[in-house]
Amino acid sequence: MFEFWPADLSKATTWPPFAIHSIDLSHFQETSSPQAIAAFVLCSIILYFGFVVVRDPLSHVPTLHWSTPLSRLSQLYTTYYHDRHFTNYSAHSEIPGKRKFRPVVRVGPNEVSLMTAAGVRTVYGGNFEKAAWYEVFSNYGKNNMFSFTGNADHAARRRIFSSNYLKSNVASPYVQQIIQSRIAKLVRFIESAVQEDSKKTQPIVVRNIYRAMQSDISTRFAFADSYGTDWLDTLNGPVNESKHTGMHVMDFFHQELREATFFWESETPFLYLNQLLVPNGPPEQQNAQKWAAGLFREFESILDKSPDRDELVRQGVYGKLYTWRNSDGEPLSFEDRASEMLDHIGAGHDTMSASLEYLTRQISLSPDVQAKLREELCVEHGGSFKTYADLDKFPYLHAVVMEGLRLVYTINFYQPRVVPKGGCTIENIYLPEGTVVGSQAYLVHRQPDIFPDPEAFKPERWLVDEEQF
């Protein structure tokens, strides 16, 4: 017979929460074996899930689906057929079709999504470590600053080149010259394309133009002004496709994030499907890594032979990675350097171009925004500005950029963190340590309590004290 203890299953400390004192074998002799086994298995499953639910530390958190406390299947289904921002956005919608949202929602057995500014500040300002999900962004089998999950590893890698990303360096005459020269070439390219296509009434595909410009800027920032790509010079044809091989292989970062292989690797790594089906990665990933490795080895050869080595090291991120040594005098391996640098170059390949493409579209569709920009840039200030400091003179331009960044979702995945020891409380909901918690800019930027009429493009909303956001 079965005997349960204690009466309150939530206080049970062992599994199963019952003891078998004796079994009457005659009962099994009278009952068919398949029926007995099926009954025993069914009872065990019911008892197990009942025990899980009773002892569940997140039972008080609203859920994506009734099955969420027990399984990730509902989350995986919507993520596979849509994407993460759709999954979490729909989870936060308390009433379908209504603009009412739940600030904290459970989207997995041990995973919580946030749609609250206070929660974002707690998680991303509270030094929470990254979840293992980030390891999908490693390259060449090595982690980089973005894919490191531990804060210590992340900080140690960041210290190598942090000076390159200081505002004082980004706003330096050297970096400004890099950016302004590529923008000037971009403007000339667009003007020429408009003149050539004016009689053909054929649209100009601006995304490829913006991708080429961004890659030219980021590679010059990574290496040195004289050793970056010149992809703006390789564009041709009605859709401005590049003739350069590198331009095509770098599209891996645009395509692969939307392919099933990324889903299997990031959402279900325990199945090892990618390792079984594409052990060396998808062809696009292999091509991107092969092209980038050749680029990095070529620049290392230049560093070894150049009489201006010290200046090249000072100017670029890769030079610092190449010459860095740890306390034992050991350098980073080539794979470590390549993984880091490919992440730096690839990270902005699609994000900046998508943001600029969205802004171009919105401004083109908004004659009133165009008129206000012309008034501010050309009439009030004569269209003259030479440094980044001059941009502070243009509050409406700043508002247009901020509104574009608010609405465009260039990074549509949420950024999971792990609740540290001791747990935390968000929106009066306690989350125990080890809980995976995260948010998406897409969600917070569409919260009507913060941004009224959130889907509308309204730059004027930023012409106030931004601290209110």
UniProtKB/Swiss-Prot annotation:
Localisation: Membrane
Signal peptide: none
Residue ranges of the TM segments: 34-54
Record keyword Membrane present: yes
Pathway per the UniProt entry: Polyketide biosynthesis
Xref: Gene3D superfamilies: Cytochrome P450
Function: Cytochrome P450 monooxygenase-like protein; part of the cluster that mediates the biosynthesis of a highly modified cyclo-arginine-tryptophan dipeptide (cRW). The first step of the pathway is perfornmed by the arginine-containing cyclodipeptide synthase (RCPDS) avaA that acts as the scaffold-generating enzyme and is responsible for formation of the cyclo-Arg-Trp (cRW) diketopiperazine. AvaB then acts as a multifunctional flavoenzyme that is responsible for generating the cyclo-Arg-formylkynurenine DKP, which can be deformylated by avaC.
Official protein name in the record: Cytochrome P450 monooxygenase-like protein avaF
Lineage, highest ranks first: Eukaryota, Fungi, Dikarya, Ascomycota, Pezizomycotina
